[in-house]
Curated annotation (Swiss-Prot):
Broad class of the protein's primary localization: cytoplasm
Subcellular location: Cytoplasm
Activity control mechanisms: Inhibited by UTP.
UniProt function note: Catalyzes the reversible phosphorylation of UMP to UDP.
Primary gene name: pyrH
EC number: 2.7.4.22
Superkingdom to which the source organism belongs: Bacteria
Residues given in the record as ATP binding sites: K12, L13, S14, G15, G55, R59, T162, N163, Y168, D171
Protein name in the entry: Uridylate kinase
Coiled-coil zones: none
Catalytic activity field: UMP + ATP = UDP + ADP
InterPro entries in the cross-refs: AceGlu_kinase-like_sf, Asp/Glu/Uridylate_kinase, Uridylate_kinase, Uridylate_kinase_bac
Pathway the protein acts in: Pyrimidine metabolism; CTP biosynthesis via de novo pathway; UDP from UMP (UMPK route): step 1/1
GO BP annotation list: 'de novo' CTP biosynthetic process; UDP biosynthetic process
Amino acid sequence: MGEPIYRRVVVKLSGEYFAGPQSYGIDQSTIDRVAGDLIAARGLGVEIAVVVGGGNIFRGVEVSARGVSRPTGDTMGMLATVMNCLALGEALQRHGQKARTLSSFVMPQVCDLYTRAAAQQTLGEGGIALLAGGTGNPFFTTDTTAVLRAAEIGADAVLKATNVDGVYSADPKRDPKATRFERLTHSEALAGGYKVMDATAFALARETSLPIIVFSIAEPGSIGTVLGGAGRATVVAG
């Protein structure tokens, strides 16, 4: 791993990835591997906050198509992100890394309430801040949450961990002619309609001048590699 080019980041992790080889739930070996990667990255001196999706447990958009209202479905999905953060937090602590789950929902028996000050305190004390509960409002994705929280806590970048190694002109799993972009501006990402993040997230990143680095989480150690400015990834900035 090279010298990190960022000092404070928000890492956005897919909830689906937490399911591992399963299609649902939490795969402990996958959680442990992600925890190890985060700890190694933290060891570089980088302050790390994490936003996790909830798609391995619940997807509000899908259930809303089956009769549940979109606000209720989205709220259920945001609660699923709390479960994922609790699982990741326990794995981090088991490996000796201080971690704190901060939720946009008030649930004092489970975790602390997210505030900007609480997140910054956790980072300043060497802990990894796990930012759960989405924005706390329906109709906003956890990608948008990651950009919002990054702007709030003064992060240098959002690291978007996916199952592909960057932003492509088309789905590389379906189109063998798809090409990977090394760099895109926020406006180009918006105009291209690339599905790696939603338009609201890209628009907010543009407004707040936040770089987004899209990379594959499949390779062990990839978080640290990206922090050093190396590896295969797409940088969305400018």
